[in-house]
Design a protein with these regions (language model features):
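Switch II (G3) loop of P-loop NTPases
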Residues: 180-189, 356-362
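Walker A (P-loop) phosphate-binding motif
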Residues: 98-145, 149-152
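Acidic, Mg2+-coordinating active-site environments of NTP-dependent enzymes
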Residues: 76-80, 175-178, 192, 201-356, ...
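Flexible beta-alpha connector loops of hexameric P-loop NTPases
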Residues: 151-162, 212-219
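ATP-dependent carboxylate-amine ligase
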Residues: 1-27, 37-43, 53-56, 91, ...
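Conserved nucleotide-sensing/catalytic segment adjacent to the nucleotide-binding pocket
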Residues: 157-187
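Residue-level signal for inorganic ion chemistry
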Residues: 42, 61, 96, 114, ...
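N-terminal leader/targeting and accessory segments in enzymes
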Residues: 1-95, 99, 277-279, 300, ...
Length: 387
């Protein structure tokens, strides 16, 4: 991180109250929303959460050396000269972090974002495998964990807070001379809350949309609009490439910016014409195989992943990679080398004379797809344990 004066750092933010004059000339060296992470010269962001008011930790942050407190709420008594009130704290954190970390997603870092109800995790793992096959130093962020180069971390949120992402991006770029790339799940919560505000995505991928998170969004149309934010660009240029699932009726409605190159994909004969298509699909206990029809020609693909629904995930990753310009040889290699994703129609083998799979089916549509995929393997019986 570089040091920047507060006046310069907040120049583009929507303030909720005038800035205290004594704050303007202070030099910021870092930023965080966790008061336990604050160091001298840093800014503390006090989020107003559903259960916890971040202002309760403002004094702790000041004692740790914070030079300013940022909040959407009014200052606590006695802290007026340290307070910066903003209209949207998470968007402000994202923009301040972007400046302090010198804007990596607008420069050397290639950022691939995957949104949708189902298939995000598997698509991200496939993308990471393809990027590695193409020679990138790769980071991965998703529901079941984060990976920065060779370092593996437990995940707290599907999409981390903005400053955490920038910290991880910085570590990834520091440990290699190869070009860095990140494949990450981008949840509707993250898009609505502003966690990726100001980040430029080289490629944005749409998997599908089914009923989920309606308690947060209030309805399917609001849920759809939240997902579409990834393709509009939030205080950043729209994605260079959009990889859209044309098998999904909602995907065909996603707004694409004039500057974005559309690469669509499909596997159903009834779907509209698409840039990339899967034909001659075969599924079995060894995985899936199909012919990948692309603008560069038709290529045979095989993956150890089980279930026809994974063909759509493979298509999403392959289309995103091809749209970005990754050679088909690296795409095929990455798909073939990508192992079973933990908890995603994952094979469990302890020597039993039958197939067991475990799947994180968190929606009714996902459960239907899993049972359909199991039946397509032509077993004598399918036993489902759900809980």
């Amino acid at each position: 991180m570089k040091s920047i004066g507060i006046a310069e750092l907040i120049a583009g933010l929507e303030l909720g109250a005038p800035l205290a004059p004594e704050l303007a000339s202070r030099l910021a060296r870092g930023v965080h929303f966790d008061s336990r992470r604050i160091e001298p010269g840093w800014i503390f962001f006090a989020f107003a959460g559903a259960n916890v008011d971040g202002r309760n930790f403002a004094l702790q942050a000041i004692e740790a050396g914070a030079i300013a407190i940022v909040s959407e709420l009014a200052p606590l008594p006695g802290l007026e000269s340290n307070w910066i009130q903003v209209k949207h704290a998470r968007k402000a954190l994202a923009l301040v972090s972007r400046s302090l970390f010198e804007n990596p997603t607008h420069g050397p870092l290639a950022l691939f974002g995957v949104t949708g109800t189902n298939g995000k995790t598997t698509t991200v793992y496939l993308l990471a495998s393809i990027l590695e096959a193409a020679g990138f130093e790769t980071g991965l962020f998703g529901t079941i964990g984060y990976r920065i180069g060779k370092q593996i971390l437990a995940s707290v949120n599907t999409t981390p807070e903005s400053v955490e992402l920038y910290e991880h991006f910085s570590h990834l770029m520091a440990e290699t001379s190869r070009r860095p790339a990140v494949a990450m799940e981008v949840s509707s919560h993250a898009l609505s809350l502003g966690r990726v505000w100001g980040m430029h995505f080289a490629v944005a991928i749409w998997t599908n949309l089914t009923r989920d998170h309606l308690d947060f969004h209030g309805g399917m149309e609001s849920y759809f609009e939240a997902k579409c934010e990834l393709f509009r660009g939030q205080d950043a240029a729209a994605p260079d490439v959009a990889a859209i699932n044309f098998d999904d009726e909602h995907g065909r409605r996603v707004p694409i910016a004039a500057s974005t190159r559309l690469w669509s994909f499909a596997m159903r004969e009834s779907s509209p014409p698409s840039t990339v298509r899967a034909i001659n699909i075969q599924t079995g206990f060894a995985g899936v195989g199909f012919d990948l029809v692309t603008p560069q020609g038709t290529f045979q693909i095989h993956s150890p992943l089980l279930g026809e629904f994974n063909v759509s995930n493979i298509l999403a990753a392959a289309t995103a990679a091809l749209g970005y310009g990754i050679p088909i040889e690296a795409v095929r290699e990455g798909i073939e080398k990508c192992p079973s994703v933990p908890g995603r129609f994952e094979r469990v083998d302890v020597g039993q004379p039958f197939l067991i799979v475990v799947d994180y089916s968190h929606t009714d549509d996902a459960i239907r797809n899993v049972i359909r995929a199991a039946r397509a393997l032509n077993p004598t019986r399918v036993i489902t344990v759900f809980g």
